[in-house]
C-alpha cells in the first residue's frame, strides 16, 4: 500500500500511479495497488 490519498492534493492520482508503477488508482483514503 502506498501513501494515503487526499483529494486536496491534485497530484495524488499521479503519485499513486507512480508508486504502483502502473495505472492503479486511489480507492477512498488509500492508494491501493492490488486492484
UniProtKB/Swiss-Prot annotation:
Claim: Hydrolase is one of the keywords in the record: no
Entry keyword Secreted: yes
Tissue specificity as recorded in UniProt: Expressed by the venom gland.
The protein's name in its UniProt record: Insectotoxin-I5
Pfam families linked to this entry: Toxin_5
Domain notes per entry: The presence of a 'disulfide through disulfide knot' structurally defines this protein as a knottin.
Similarity field: Belongs to the short scorpion toxin superfamily. Chloride channel inhibitor family.
Entry function: Toxin with unknown function in healthy organisms. On glioma cells, interacts with chloride channels (probably ClC-3/CLCN3) and MMP2 at the surface of glioma cells. This complex is then internalized via caveolae, thus inhibiting the chloride channels necessary for cell shrinkage and tumor propagation.
InterPro entries: Scorpion_toxin-like_sf, Scorpion_toxinS_Cl_inh
S-S bonds: 2-19, 5-26, 16-31, 20-33
UniProt-recorded Gene Ontology molecular function terms: chloride channel regulator activity; toxin activity
Subcellular location: Secreted
Keyword tags: Chloride channel impairing toxin, Disulfide bond, Ion channel impairing toxin, Knottin, Secreted, Toxin, Voltage-gated chloride channel impairing toxin
GO cellular component terms, A-Z: extracellular region
Amino acid at each position: 500500500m502506498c501513501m494515503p490519498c487526499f483529494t486536496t492534493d491534485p497530484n495524488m492520482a499521479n503519485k499513486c500511479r507512480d508508486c504502483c508503477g502502473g495505472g492503479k488508482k486511489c480507492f477512498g483514503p488509500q492508494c491501493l495497488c492490488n486492484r
